[in-house]
Curated annotation (Swiss-Prot):
Protein name: Small ribosomal subunit protein uS17
Pfam family, one: Ribosomal_S17
RNA-binding recorded as keyword: yes
Family in the record: Belongs to the universal ribosomal protein uS17 family.
Stored CDD domains: Ribosomal_uS17
Name of the gene this protein is made from: rpsQ
GO MF terms held by the record: rRNA binding; structural constituent of ribosome
Gene Ontology cellular component list: cytosolic small ribosomal subunit
Quaternary structure and interacting proteins, as annotated: Part of the 30S ribosomal subunit.
Keyword Ubl conjugation: no
Keyword line: Ribonucleoprotein, Ribosomal protein, RNA-binding, rRNA-binding
HAMAP family noted in UniProt: Ribosomal_uS17_B
Length: 85
């Protein structure tokens, strides 16, 4: 599998309480098939953060990768925006 074929998402870190693991909330908008109203959807992904460098509130880019643990199939690739302390 090439790296270009891997899924990439952008989201906000909502939990940094685990060691080397971050919970990233990815929000998106879809159109309802029958009523055609735009609906906001959100999903949480557990992502691997090797250096523990992200904090809660950071906007990050995550990429699909091989399973790291039972729930982790994503890794943090880039920090787009840091939170102000």
């Amino acid at each position: 599998m090439e790296r270009s074929n891997r899924k990439v998402r952008t989201g906000r870190v909502v939990s940094d309480k685990m060691d080397k693991t971050r919970v990233v909330l990815v929000e998106g908008r879809t159109k309802h098939p029958l009523y055609e109203k735009t609906v906001k959807q959100a999903k949480k992904f557990k992502a691997h953060d090797e250096a523990n460098e992200t904090r809660e509130g950071d906007v990050v880019k995550i990429m699909e990768t091989r399973p790291t643990s039972k729930d982790k199939r994503w890794r943090i690739v880039d920090i787009i925006e840091r939170t102000k302390l």
